[in-house]
């Protein structure tokens, strides 16, 4: 069973012109709107997207969404944004009012499947005493973070001073008896990051798990990263 993203329904991005095409009159080339599809356990199964430019109007391209995450040149031109800012840009470029999200979804015509697999078992098979389930997720992101953005995350998440060498920032949340911890790490030497989230569930409120994953993903989007996929390891 597939479900839409548990957080804010759609993600918005601004696409900047190529460096050799930029002028004082054109600061934004277009807008991209995306939505992940997910299994009931919140792992990613696919991505829907639509793009808009003043010249072409609305169109859909899975290749564009892939390029936003894999093409180094494209990565420099894509900026995560809010719906409010996307509305302002859409209006400034002559598109008038940005359509409602229900209407935007009608432009999702080129679905990109994302391969999934049964959860890999990392860490202990049994949860600690007092919890009925242990889950581990990894959210992968493209683009890079500046030092001040990492510092902002450490402050927001109250990362202990020093921390661990493997993690750039960490956080913890206790909610109605459930415990969530997370670690932000750089992936290799490329422009990529991952957020590892461990959930120890005492209740049956899996909706809290979905909202926590979604909010953490959105926090990193607001800091400039582009989500790629959500995998489950336990």
Model feature map: region roles:
Residues 1-80:
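Ordered, small/hydrophobic-rich secondary-structure cores
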Residues 15-18, 56, 82-83, 89, ...:
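Long, hydrophilic "mature protein body" segments
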Residues 21, 144-147, 200-207:
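Short acidic, S/G/P-rich loop/turn micro-motifs used as interaction or catalytic elements
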Residues 66-68, 123-131, 182-190:
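Short, flexible, solvent-exposed loop/turn segments with mixed acidic/basic and small polar residues
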Residues 75-82, 90, 95, 225-227:
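Short glycine-aromatic motifs
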Residues 174-234:
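Extended, charged low-complexity segments
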